Amino acid sequence: MLTLGRKTLSVPILQGGMGVGVSLGGLAGAVAACGGMGCISTADAGYREPDFARDPASANHRALTAEIKKAKQIAKGAGMVAINAMVATQDYAAAIRTAVEAGVDAVVSGAGLPLELPGIVGTTDVAIAPIVSSGRAAKLILRRWAKEFGRTADFVVIEGCKAGGHLGFAEDDLLAGKCQTLDDILPEVLAEVKPFEAQFGHSIPVFVAGGVYTGADMAHFTAMGAAGVQLATRFITTYECDASQGYKDVLLNARPEDVRIIHSPVGMPGRALNTPLVQALAEGTRFPPRHCARCLKTCDPAKVPYCITHALIEAVKGNVEEGLFFCGANVGRLDRMRTVQELMDELVTEWRQNL
């Protein structure tokens, strides 16, 4: 058993948050039911709501509440149900408060430094965790939390350079293959959390993500001192994943050479498949937003090359022409559909065999 805040996991596996609409209550609940941590992405969780175009904030908060309750019902008290909240999003704080009110077990936060997260969550039993890509970032966040809020992280997630979606590395370094590896970053983060473990009198488990694919990978990192791992791309090709089968088929058919590093309106690089949209953007084509929901703090709709909300919603529907399909570096290894239980059992069995 692994303690994270006031809750425990029987399996040290986190399912990474994937928006828009890829990881909602169905997937998160199934992972939690297996003893892991399922994670709902707050990014436009209400994209299917009838009033989403007119009032996205209300639609998203209503849907987020429903998805958390759905996940909890599926989990039946097992594991943990979390949300992934991106600092870069306009409704960041409001989404977290909605999730806390809905009974979420943990908030995992990245796409920027979640410096204010303890203040947003408040004096609740909800576990909090930053997503970091360096020991320096971990130290900066934990020092701020300790000084300003008298609190520390309940766990930390390291996302390495092989992760899917938004990446906390310089675009030039990603393209040149010069980023630190998880093997480099993990010891740094473990060293940085130690003073805060001593100060607050409890362990701060560290999970690694980004390129973790097998139970053998899991064994490698737990032997180095990680408490467990986070996977995302592998969970897309499960029956319980909330994306359309069309979305899943695109990833199942992807080859290693189809992966690209793209620039996101979030202001960060990202890893995605080389679809017609990505190809057109690389050639300099601009796709002006048809309708702006003001989903990002830094986005200028008059200048942005494309609307990431529209592109991700089209992807989750399976629209290859207009969709942006985020993926991890190992997407080419996906071979078939599985149930969440089958995938979790496979990972845990391989992990134990390689310990």
Located regions from the model:
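Active-site entrance/lid segments in N-terminal catalytic domains of soluble metabolic enzymes
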Residues: M1-Q199
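Conserved active-site-proximal phosphate/metal-binding subdomains
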Residues: L14, A163-L182, L186-F207, Y213-L355
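Residue-level detector of alpha-helix initiation sites
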Residues: V22, V212-Y213
